[in-house]
């Protein structure tokens, strides 16, 4: 992945690896989704006590991502390897849910 980052790929958001069940996602995208999720939770748009387990798991993932960013262990533009299903939720299904919580 560090080699990929030196090959001028800042606009490439999703990189499929040799293993189909793993993908590389830009840490910037995860960080942006984390901020959106926090705003929805803080604004009371999502029921905190009754949030689905997958939503809380995503929140944990986003929190860890932001922790890595804050500690400069995941610099801007870095690619993070995730299971394909998790990456798909973070960048697609999760965004749809956050935009349409009801």
UniProtKB/Swiss-Prot annotation:
Keyword Cell division (UniProt): no
GO molecular function: IgE binding; nutrient reservoir activity
Keywords from the UniProt entry: Allergen, IgE-binding protein, Seed storage protein, Storage protein
InterPro entries, per the entry: RmlC_Cupin_sf (IPR011051)
Domain of life of the native organism: Eukaryota
Family named by the database record: Belongs to the 11S seed storage protein (globulins) family.
Role this protein plays: Seed storage protein.
Protein name: Legumin-like protein Mac i 2
Source organism phylogeny: Eukaryota, Viridiplantae, Streptophyta, Embryophyta, Tracheophyta
């Amino acid at each position: 992945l560090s080699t990929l980052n030196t090959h001028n790929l800042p606009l490439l958001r999703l990189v499929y690896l040799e293993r189909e069940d793993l993908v590389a996602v830009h840490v910037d995208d995860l960080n942006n989704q984390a901020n959106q999720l926090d705003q929805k939770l803080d604004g009371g748009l999502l029921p905190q006590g009754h949030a689905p387990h997958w939503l809380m798991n995503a929140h944990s993932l986003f929190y860890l991502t932001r922790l890595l960013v804050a500690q400069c262990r995941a610099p801007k533009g870095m690619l993070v390897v995730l299971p394909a299903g998790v990456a798909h939720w973070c960048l697609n299904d999760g965004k749809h849910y956050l935009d349409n919580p009801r």
